[in-house]
A protein has these predicted regions:
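Nucleotidyl polymerases of mobile genetic elements and RNA viruses
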Residues: 1-163
Length: 163
């Protein structure tokens, strides 16, 4: 998360003597769970150039993997899930995919958190999410909706690391 951004939100709410509830959400192996088909559809939905989508698809359509186990490499197979580790494009692709999940989760969600006239439900950096709410029930509802939306895209919230 951007340095001190959550702290700034807290400070503003404390200054105005308003309740602010947080939940820090962690996904299990988030970058490994990006569904390629959903990513391409999301890019199209967000009006990203079809030529650019095709170039990225070509990079990923040729991607193969193999499992190294007991000092030997297994059979090679095509990958249809995950973004490439170490690739400069991976964070951007992940953010596009996560935006789809978050949009589905917070669609029609009423949030009591407002700063500078803007309604805020979450702060994000890569796969780190700070869910925000003005009441405990509202926060629980946000987490439930996020869990449903992420499960639909085969991304799992880590109960152990979410607090």
């Amino acid at each position: 998360m951007k340095r001190k951004r959550s702290c700034w939100c807290c400070k503003k709410y404390f200054q105005h003597q308003q309740d602010l509830y947080h939940v820090f959400i962690d996904f299990k192996k988030a970058f490994d769970r990006v569904l390629h088909a959903a990513l391409w559809a999301t890019m199209k939905k967000y009006n990203i150039s079809t030529n650019l989508i095709q170039v990225i698809k070509n990079l990923y359509n040729k991607a193969t993997s193999a499992v190294f186990f007991n000092s030997s490499i297994g059979d090679w197979f095509r990958t249809t899930v995950g973004v490439r580790q170490g690739c400069l494009l991976s964070l951007t692709l992940f953010n596009i995919f996560l935006e789809r999940i978050m949009t589905d989760a917070i669609e029609d969600h009423e949030s009591a958190v407002s700063i500078g006239g803007r309604t805020i439900t979450n702060l994000r950096f890569a796969d780190d999410i700070d869910g925000l709410a003005g009441a405990g029930e509202e926060l629980a509802n946000l987490v439930e909706r996020l869990d449903e939306a992420s499960t639909a895209y085969r991304v799992e919230i880590s109960a152990e690391k979410t607090n």
